[in-house]
Regions:
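Conserved catalytic core of nucleotide-sugar-dependent glycosyltransferases
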Residues: 3, 9-95
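C-terminal catalytic/acceptor-binding lobe
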Residues: 84-86, 90-167
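A structural signal for short, well-ordered beta-strand segments and their strand-loop junctions
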Residues: 2-5, 43-48, 103-106, 149-151
Length: 167
């Protein structure tokens, strides 16, 4: 197992009883690692985005077979490697699930990060400055036309993935 993380994650939080508490130690990582080590069929795991777990809504501790974005705990035994230029994390999740592997998205642990294109560096200048998010979204749709399509989200072109076939 190994971790891969985006460079624009600002904080990690514990989400319990609709309360978010900032984590100042590595405890969330140890807990997620401990969880996945109990199973042989997990390809990836990681924390959900804090923005998707408002304190007003209850959430289960984890969700199976959905996206793992930006902060990934990856099983070294899966036969897949990064491919493409954009959305490599989503592509990796989809390929694994299509082959029967599971993903675990933790709601008990959350990541707070800046939105795409709001922080200089990373892929902002190289990929997004000219064409926005269109090419990145289009590439994922072309790789997974059976479950992905283009949509408008957050005032920009984005991809939308139907994860229902993996439930």
């Amino acid at each position: 197992w190994h971790w891969v993380m985006d460079d624009n994650i600002e904080a990690f939080e514990r989400y319990n009883n609709n309360m978010k508490v900032k984590c100042l130690t590595g405890s969330p990582f140890y807990a997620m690692e401990d969880f996945v080590l109990r199973y042989k069929n997990i390809a990836q795991a990681g924390p959900n985005y804090s923005i998707f777990c408002p304190a007003t809504d209850g959430r289960p501790q984890y969700k199976l077979n959905t996206r793992i974005y930006s902060c990934l705990l990856i099983n070294n035994k899966i036969p897949y490697r990064w491919r493409g230029r954009y959305n490599e994390d989503t592509d990796l999740s989809l390929r694994a699930m299509k082959d029967g592997w599971c993903t675990v998205q933790f709601n008990a642990f959350l990541q707070s990060k800046r939105a795409t294109q709001t922080l200089k560096g990373g892929n902002t200048e190289e990929f997004y400055a000219k064409d926005g998010t269109y090419n990145k979204s289009k590439m994922l749709v072309e790789m997974h036309p059976d479950v992905a399509f283009l949509s408008d989200k957050w005032n920009r072109v984005h991809h939308h993935v139907n994860y229902e076939p993996f439930k």
